[in-house]
Swiss-Prot record:
Pathway entry: Protein biosynthesis; polypeptide chain elongation
HAMAP family cross-referenced by the UniProt entry: EF_G_EF_2_B
Family as reported in the entry's similarity comment: Belongs to the TRAFAC class translation factor GTPase superfamily. Classic translation factor GTPase family. EF-G/EF-2 subfamily.
Gene Ontology biological process terms from the UniProt entry: mitochondrial translational elongation
SUPFAM superfamilies named among the record's database cross-references: EF-G C-terminal domain-like, P-loop containing nucleoside triphosphate hydrolases, Ribosomal protein S5 domain 2-like, Translation proteins
Gene name tied to this protein: MEFG1
One cellular-component annotation, GO: mitochondrion
Name of the protein described by the UniProt record: Elongation factor G-1, mitochondrial
Pfam families xref list: EFG_C, EFG_III, EFG_IV, GTP_EFTU, GTP_EFTU_D2
Record InterPro entries: EFG_II, EFG_III, EFG_III/V, EFG_IV, EFG_V, EFG_V-like, EFTu-like_2, G_TR_CS
Tissue: Expressed in cotyledons and adult leaves at the same levels.
Binding site for GTP: 72-79, 139-143, 193-196
Boundaries of the annotated transit peptide in chain numbering: 1-17
Keyword Lipid metabolism part of the UniProt annotation: no
Length: 754
């Protein structure tokens, strides 16, 4: 193995980097110090940490609290990184690997399925202490099928670590989770992982982050060696080299900067200062005046820019090889915000949903958001983020969404699937409550205010399966399992096919649904037969169409009479709502008491379009006139009038079928590029990108989901088992006339045989 010289840096290099004296700032103090052995955890240290964590957290300064998530593309090393974080902070005392080869598995992958498959399926919460800072951590899945876990984690977090693979670079799910971070305005640091891997190129990944993620970013470290020669890191802020010794990298030792790296270090530090100065006025003034920048000044500028989301500092390392994790932890507490540095808002339901800024003070009224539900051993486990006030065991709290008054029977802090009972939690905390019934997204207060938090983004399912229990005796457990899964996961839906009577489950992909079928078998002892996956098509209209329908039945006894007049039209592109109903009747042509029944009728009709029986979306219905009968009009009559009116005008609105289109990213050896690209074209895919990464080609394409079934097998065959791919939902778009005709004919044929 090649070794790098460690001769002392010459005086000219030190002068270039200005003063490196110990700073009085709290952030700078985290990384400076006149010591060689920076951190070594012993059993005594772990015991001290455990003792500290028993103290009520609300007494700690809010400045010393961090709520962070760890997100990335699948197999980038998120859970491995979290395992090291827990070890170095003394939260666990042994390191276990993700796939559980030792029979244990990573702490944060508590489900048997997670340990067997080597992937994270559910987000998991934990907490730890690092240099007097309390850190709540949520480890999230990387597979696109479990994207809701990322959504609800980021909804309640104040900061995040975006993990990037030094070989794979910025991949499709990297782009997705970064977009989610932007949606919830979450400041982040990046961690380029796996520097020990063959083909590691952190500078290429940094440039990809700038181009693909539009990050204004720069490295805060330089690696000493790469691949099998990766030995340590050079901190560009404090101009120090760090090496990671010990069987698990627990001893971080400061050393001299290798002489042959001095030029690169000077160049990269200047690049860091210049990049940050572009978004920070204080640093810009010093940079433009060519004044020396001290470590504390640079660190404070990075913190300001990171919290303002105008800069993303980039850390490096190898979690698996136990290198670079402790400096990353320093970066988390130095650069990511505390809860009181983040602007959180609620909607005042007593004041027309006016936005109210939450102070984040423990002394304010309680405001907490339920963001995740689980079925625990002792009943429903509800994860809460406390935004303001204090919640205590035994308190009575109000569910603002339902109006119910609930007692808090048990309050816990989670450590993956383990829990620690606590008496209270204050603003900024992430905790869990047992024994309260609620839905994901509900807001709780102490009753003194009527605030609700804005909801999280929940994507629509794109795939469905017909399922039924093998044994009729399992019907009760079958229903119980499906009800629980729906409560836990907003993207998992259960319905009944009105024609076949089959139970239909819908979700974000094949893996998503397979996991729930397997969980049903393991957790509820229900074996189920599963039909072929089917795509969740949609229908929509393309032009305005009028309707004028009279529903009349008067053949003795109570009659039915209701007339509705108006039009249907497509909603503008990009509308958030999928269905709109507007009553524009002037006067009392239809009594106002019947209007809700009319809206209900149109909604019911739109649940099943006449082309292929799938839901109709992007639809606006306007009611302009109508007529009623003093005796025979009823809610049922007007509901039926709306249903028939919709069916009659639907064809005139020129309906089309929409299909889910997936963003597919393939990585294949270049020798197979032509074959794979040709196959994508056969599947009616559109190639939108083609990059070269060493000996591999990375192809990006938009492909109809209906043409992607069985693709894993086909790709293995085409590439001799060397190709890999990921895909995520992009949009629903109109099918071609040819495909629409085929789908309509197939639907008509199936109806004819019933």
């Amino acid at each position: 193995m090649a070794r790098f010289p460690t001769s002392p840096a010459p005086n000219r290099l030190l002068r270039l980097f200005s003063s490196n004296k110990r700073s009085s700032s709290p952030t700078a103090a985290l990384l400076t110090g006149d010591f060689q052995l920076i951190r070594h955890f012993s059993a005594g240290t772990a015991a001290r940490v455990a003792k500290d964590e028993k103290e009520p957290w609300w007494k700690e300064s809010m400045d010393k609290l961090r709520n962070i998530g760890i997100s990335a593309h699948i197999d980038s090393g998120k859970t491995t990184l979290t395992e090291r974080v827990l070890f170095y902070t003394g939260r666990i005392h042994e390191i276990h690997e993700v796939r559980g080869r030792d029979g244990v598995g990573a702490k944060m992958d508590s489900m048997d399925l997670e340990r067997e498959k080597g992937i994270t399926i559910q987000s998991a919460a934990t907490y730890c202490t690092w240099k007097d800072y309390k850190v709540n951590i949520i480890d999230t899945p990387g597979h696109v099928d479990f994207t809701i876990e990322v959504e609800r984690a980021l909804r309640v977090l104040d900061g995040a670590i975006l993990v990037l693979c030094s070989v794979g670079g910025v991949q499709s799910q990297s782009i997705t989770v970064d977009r989610q971070m932007r949606r919830y305005e979450v400041p982040r640091v990046a961690f380029i992982n796996k520097l020990d891997r063959m083909g590691a190129d952190p500078w290429k990944v940094l440039n990809q982050a700038r181009a693909k993620l539009r990050h204004h970013s720069a490295a805060v470290q330089v690696p000493i060696g790469l691949e099998e020669n990766f030995q340590g890191l050079i901190d560009l802020i404090h101009v120090k080299a760090y090496f990671f010794h010990g069987s698990s990298g627990e001893n971080v030792v400061a050393g001299d900067i290798p002489a042959d790296m001095e030029g690169l270090v000077a160049e990269k530090r200047r690049e860091l200062i210049e990049t940050v100065s572009e978004v920070d006025d204080v640093l810009a003034e010093k940079f433009l005046n060519d004044e020396p920048v001290s470590a504390s000044e640079l660190e404070e500028a990075i913190r300001r820019a990171t919290i303002a989301q105008t800069f993303v500092p980039v850390f490096m390392g190898s979690a698996f090889k136990n290198k670079g994790v402790q400096p990353l932890l320093d970066g988390v507490v130095s650069f990511l915000p505390s809860p009181n540095e983040v602007n959180n808002y609620a909607l005042d339901q007593n004041n027309n949903e006016e936005r109210v800024t939450l102070t984040g003070s423990p002394d304010g009224p309680l405001v907490a958001l339920a963001f995740k539900l689980e079925e625990g051993r002792f009943g429903q486990l509800t994860y809460l983020r406390v935004y303001e006030g204090v919640i205590k065991k035994g308190d009575f709290i109000i569910n603002v969404n339902t109006g119910k008054r609930i007692k808090v029977p048990r309050l816990v802090r989670m450590h993956s699937n383990d829990m620690e009972d606590i008496q209270e939690a204050h603003a900024g905390q992430i905790v869990a409550v047992f024994g309260i019934e609620c839905a994901s997204g509900d807001t709780f207060t102490d009753g003194s205010v009527k605030y609700t938090m804005t909801s999280m983004n929940v994507p629509e399912p794109v795939m469905s399966l017909a399922v039924q229990p093998v044994s009729k005796d399992s019907g009760g457990q079958f229903s119980k399992a499906l009800n629980r899964f729906q409560k836990e996961d907003p993207t998992f839906r259960v319905g009944l096919d009105p024609e076949s009577g089959q139970t239909i489950i819908s979700g974000m992909g094949e893996l998503h649904l397979d996991i729930y079928v397997e969980r049903m078998r393991r957790e509820y002892k229900v074996d189920a037969t599963v039909g072929k996956p089917r795509v969740n098509f949609r229908e929509t209209i393309t032009q305005r169409a009028e309707f004028d329908y009279l529903h009349k039945k008067q053949s003795g006894g109570a009659g039915q009479y209701g007339r509705v007049t108006g039009y249907v039209e497509p909603l503008p592109p990009g509308s958030k709502e999928k269905f709109e109903f507007e009553n524009m009747i002037v006067g009392q042509a239809i009594p106002s008491g019947f209007i809700p029944a009319i809206e209900k009728g149109f909604k019911e009709a739109a649940n099943s379009g006449s082309l292929i029986g799938h839901p109709v979306e992007n639809l606006r219905i306007v009611l302009t006139d109508g007529a009623s009968h003093a005796v025979d009009s009823s809610e049922l009559a007007f509901k039926m009038a709306a249903i028939y009116a919709f069916r009659l005008c639907y064809t005139a609105a020129r309906p089309v079928i929409l299909e889910p289109v997936m963003l597919v990213e393939l990585k294949v050896p270049t020798e197979f590029q032509g074959t794979v690209a040709g196959d994508i074209n056969k599947r009616k895919g559109i190639i939108v990108g083609n990059d070269q990464e060493g000996d591999d080609s990375v192809i990006t394409a938009n492909v109809p989901l209906n043409n992607m079934f069985g693709y894993s097998t086909s790709l293995r065959s085409m590439t001799q088992g060397k190709g890999e791919f990921t895909m995520e939902y992009k949009e629903h778009s109109a099918v071609s006339n040819e495909v629409q005709a085929q789908l309509v004919n197939a639907y008509s044929a199936s109806k004819a045989t019933e």
